[in-house]
Amino acid sequence: MPDTYIAIMLQSLKKKEQVLDEIIRLDDRQKDTLTDPECPFDVFDETVEAKSACIDQLNQLDSGFEKLYAQVAEELDQNREDYAKEIRDMQQCIRRVTDKSVKIQAQEARNKELMREKFATIHRQAKAVRKNSRAITGYYNSTVSYTHLRAHETLANLV
């Protein structure tokens, strides 16, 4: 029975690597959406939702791994030599998972800064639009007033 649990744990770690690879890919896609001014916001939203699904999957994998480990920890500890290869394989997977996690953290920090810059740009653009809108409204009001005034003068001259 412990052999089966250990095999499942190793399989779980490999699946976690695949999910982390997907998150790395999605982080790159997110960077592209943040740096492309023409990219619709929907694409960014889809990427965030896909990453959220991956994170949920990681949490499930972690939970399952921990439960299995709790059941075989004593067996692994007592019979280290019997499970040396499996332990080595798991350690290698854990190293790769850790490396990928570090890469993801760096990508997330970069994307957070890009997002901050993008929102600052959007804020500046919105401010400029409001300012231009007020200027156009002011121009329109002054034009209407002038036209109204000229129409009044013409009417007075006709009578």
What are these regions (language model features)?
Residues 2-57:
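Long, hydrophobic N-terminal alpha-helical segment
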Residues 34, 38-41, 69, 73-76, ...:
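Coiled-coil heptad-register positions
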Residues 53-68, 96-107:
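Amphipathic alpha-helical coiled-coil segments
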Residues 60-82:
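Short, solvent-exposed, charged loop/turn and helix-capping segments
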Residues 87-121:
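Acidic/histidine-rich alpha-helical segments that form the ligand environment
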Residues 147-154:
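Conserved small/polar residues in nucleotide/adenosyl-binding loops
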